[in-house]
């Protein structure tokens, strides 16, 4: 079904179940723990509490935040908050993830680990990642690189990278 012909409620439902978002400004809820922030999407989807806890714990471990599940965003570094935001976006295994600078505030090793996780999700689950970035490392690892200038596409190139 075409999204431009969908009702608002259907669009909201489609976004909730099919699209993950990584915002450059994180948009974490400061009074919730890292784990509760990650669980939020699944709670809105109606996932049972036990399953939410299990999945959120596992994904936080995958992004390197094991042991920090009970910390609230103000108690985390910028890079840790970024990884909570990524975990929240991918925990429900959406079809598409829209990510604005997902490796901002991360050191190169952590950024590479995160890109490896994205590649794994793409290969195993068919998740498509649409990433806005200035990071050359992400650009090198992408399956397709679309460059914009002043809002216009100036190049659209298939690459040998793995993330797409």
Per-range role (PLM):
Residues 144, 152-164:
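Conserved beta-strand-loop-alpha-helix hinge in the C-terminal portion
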């Amino acid at each position: 079904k075409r999204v431009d012909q969908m009702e608002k409620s259907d669009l909201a439902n489609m976004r909730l179940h099919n699209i993950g978002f990584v915002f450059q400004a994180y948009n974490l809820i400061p009074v919730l723990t890292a784990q509760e922030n990650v669980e939020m999407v699944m709670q809105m989807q109606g996932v049972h509490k036990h399953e939410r806890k299990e999945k959120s714990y596992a994904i936080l471990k995958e992004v390197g935040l094991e042991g920090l599940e009970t910390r609230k965003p103000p108690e985390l570094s910028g890079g840790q908050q970024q990884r909570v935001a990524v975990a929240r976006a991918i925990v429900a295994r959406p079809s598409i993830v829209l990510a604005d600078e997902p490796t901002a505030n991360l050191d190169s090793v952590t950024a590479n680990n995160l890109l490896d996780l994205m590649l794994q999700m793409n290969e195993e689950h068919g998740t498509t990642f649409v990433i806005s970035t200035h990071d050359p490392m992400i650009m090198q690892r992408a399956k397709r690189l679309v460059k914009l200038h002043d809002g216009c596409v100036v190049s659209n190139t298939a690459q040998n990278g793995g993330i797409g």
